[in-house]
């Protein structure tokens, strides 16, 4: 192990999302989001479940805060349920005081315990009423105004205690999984809608950031940014075709959001392939969008090998996987087909982002679902050897990126604090460092939680 340490200011903790943990879908005035609706559609969720109960964190949040405290974290990243705060979502719709009070109390408790809140405004749960009213993210003018209004209410209600804001979590997933292949809510299948939705989300993000900077930043002193998801990508072999495919895949996954937000324009390969199906920014919009994130929020889990080909335009006509040309695997297989352990890729990705986009990086999600863990009794599930090995590799890569390569990485959040509702997989896949018995809601720390607590204690300057 390296003797080098992360700076004293480095923050670490765990991340969650409202729909994955809260439950209580209609308690205290909350109304449905598109995920409540989507879960009711037959065949959409692998085990036929929903987030109706999840980890019951709307009621058990104090227990969650105490768990965070016991793990010694410095920060906690969580998301707000828009339809808990403005049940019907719109700028003319009534505000739900009970929803604001709930989050205010949670934030106050975190601050009291010395845990810094990192608050995500949108983690995929659009109020259903807005989807019904005007098609949600497909409607540029309406969606931007309603999101900005919601953001403003959150800045007003919580901004005196919250210094770290994230507008959107993983717009790639929202647009591609929600509007491209239909695997996630609202379940649309289209080859044009994802580009429209992406475009509108980038603009909604930029409008919310401008509002924060104009009206709140000076008195509240916080920072605001966005979280993008990306794997590290490596050419499958040494051919020019694989190298070009890798660059193209990176633009289609990451560049489609990062380039406009940090550089002010869409990447060249996307423009070339999509032509006039790619919406254009006006000069005024470019000015608004460019530089609209104070940091780079990164969700990353794995590395993929890339080769040219395939019919998937949303991915950039590439094929990806974990099997090398010689038949060996990149790393340990997880419970999700797309995820294997590969620590070196994490180090390379951190270096790439820091250099390419010139902003401090916060790793806002990183984690591993152990293969078959859901089938194990709790006594075995907590002895999560593969997850511990994953975190050992990834924390070491983080340390090397910061202390050896000089990458400006300022925070790290493990996914997730708890086993929870894993979207289309339902409750079959477990990402938590804390085991949850869904029958009783009993929380039991896994060995990986112990490992991370110890590692960060040893590797952050006193």
From Swiss-Prot:
Substitution effect: residue 229 to N: 17-fold decrease in affinity for cellobiose and displays more acidic optimum pH than wild-type. No effect on optimum pH
Reaction catalyzed: Hydrolysis of terminal, non-reducing beta-D-glucosyl residues with release of beta-D-glucose
pH dependence: Optimum pH is 6.0-6.5.
InterPro entries linked to this entry: Glyco_hydro_1, Glyco_hydro_1_beta-glucosidase, Glyco_hydro_1_N_CS, Glycoside_hydrolase_SF
Induction: Expressed constitutively in cellobiose and glucose cultures.
Catalytic activity, EC: 3.2.1.21
UniProt cross-references to SUPFAM superfamilies, sorted A to Z: (Trans)glycosidases
Keyword entries, A-Z: Carbohydrate metabolism, Cellulose degradation, Glycosidase, Hydrolase, Polysaccharide degradation
Record-annotated active site: 170 (proton donor), 365 (nucleophile)
Gene Ontology biological process: cellulose catabolic process
Residues annotated as binding substrate: 20, 123, 169, 301, 415, 422-423
Outcome of swapping residue 231 to D: 3-fold decrease in affinity for cellobiose
MF annotations from Gene Ontology: beta-glucosidase activity; cellobiose glucosidase activity
Effect of residue 173 to C: 2-fold decrease in affinity for cellobiose
Pfam family, one: Glyco_hydro_1
UniProt record similarity statement: Belongs to the glycosyl hydrolase 1 family.
Functional description taken from the UniProt entry: Plays an important role in cellulose degradation. Shows hydrolytic activity against several glycosidic compounds.
Protein name listed in UniProt: Beta-glucosidase 1A
Annotated gene: BGL1A
């Amino acid at each position: 192990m390296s003797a080098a340490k992360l700076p004293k200011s480095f923050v670490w903790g765990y991340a969650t999302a409202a729909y994955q943990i809260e439950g209580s879908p209609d308690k205290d005035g909350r109304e449905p989001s598109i995920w409540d609706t989507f879960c009711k559609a037959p065949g959409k969720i692998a085990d036929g479940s929903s987030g109706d109960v999840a980890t019951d964190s709307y009621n058990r949040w104090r227990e969650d805060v105490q768990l965070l405290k016991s793990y010694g974290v410095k920060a906690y990243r969580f998301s707000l349920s828009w339809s808990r705060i403005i049940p019907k979502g719109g700028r003319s719709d009534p505000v739900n005081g009970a929803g604001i009070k709930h989050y205010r109390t949670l934030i106050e408790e975190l601050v009291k315990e010395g845990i810094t809140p990192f608050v995500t405004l949108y983690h995929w749960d659009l109020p259903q009423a807005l989807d019904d009213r005007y098609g949600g993210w497909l409607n540029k003018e309406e969606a931007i105004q309603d999101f900005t209004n919601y953001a403003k209410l959150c800045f007003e209600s919580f901004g005196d205690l919250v210094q770290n804001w994230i507008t959107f979590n993983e717009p790639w997933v929202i647009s591609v999984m929600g509007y491209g292949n239909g695997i996630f809510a609202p379940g649309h299948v289209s080859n044009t809608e994802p580009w429209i939705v992406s475009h509108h989300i980038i603009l909604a993000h930029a409008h919310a950031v401008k509002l924060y900077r104009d009206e709140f930043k000076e008195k509240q002193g916080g920072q605001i940014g966005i979280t993008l998801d990306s794997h590290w990508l490596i050419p499958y072999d040494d051919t020019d075709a694989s190298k070009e495919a890798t660059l193209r895949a990176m633009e289609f996954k990451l560049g489609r959001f990062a380039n406009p937000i940090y550089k002010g324009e869409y990447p060249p390969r996307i423009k070339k392939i999509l032509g006039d199906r790619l919406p254009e920014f006006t000069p005024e919009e470019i000015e608004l969008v460019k530089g609209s994130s104070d940091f780079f929020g990164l969700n990353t889990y794995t590395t993929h090998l890339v080769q040219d080909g395939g019919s998937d335009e949303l991915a950039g006509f590439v094929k990806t996987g974990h099997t090398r040309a010689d038949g060996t695997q990149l790393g340990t297989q997880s419970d999700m087909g797309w995820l294997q352990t590969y620590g070196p890729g994490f180090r390379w990705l951190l270096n790439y982002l820091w250099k390419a986009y010139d902003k401090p990086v916060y790793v806002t999600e990183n984690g591993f679902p152990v293969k078959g863990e859901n089938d194990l009794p709790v006594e075995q599930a907590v002895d999560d050897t593969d997850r511990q090995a994953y975190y050992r590799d990834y924390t070491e890569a983080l340390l090397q990126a910061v202390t050896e390569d000089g990458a400006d990485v300022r925070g790290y959040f493990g996914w997730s604090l708890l086993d929870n509702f894993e979207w289309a997989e339902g409750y079959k896949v477990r990402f938590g460092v804390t085991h949850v018995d869904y029958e009783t809601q009993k929380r039991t720390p896994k060995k990986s939680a112990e490992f991370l607590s110890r590692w960060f204690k040893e590797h952050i300057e006193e």
